[in-house]
């Protein structure tokens, strides 16, 4: 207990609440436009892992650069720490190719990948997934049996068919067109009525906008 886990700052409060509930100690690390600040991360001692959202940082919307990702992987290898990648909002990149998962950068990278279907199916569709190294599969299977007793098997079978038959990918393509138009409309409205008060921060993707006021 009391293991230290680094998190991006600003962060998703639920992540902090969950860590503290489990007896972990969250260590906030500032985020830059290139991703989590590696130099500040290196100054921390005895960090067991780091939770990052490299594809679309919440709440600022930054996308971690490939160079920063490489540095993060190198840090994890040196420290013997785990990287937990929450692939938040990654499907909805407008006019851009999907970004590779951190584990794809290097074989054997100490990464645990988290994904969810909530953003692209519907908000109440609470089904998520994890991709873990082979040596951790048994551990996570045991944990899943203890903490997840309510996931609908029917929903899982339907989703599997939806993906295998190619419907999921065409569905995501349609969603991207819809959300891109909505985002563009929101950006235009903000530019017209609020530009004197601040600016939009982050990349042009995902389902949320972050507006930074000039004078908080």
Name what the model sees in each region.
Residues 1-216:
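PLP-dependent class I/II
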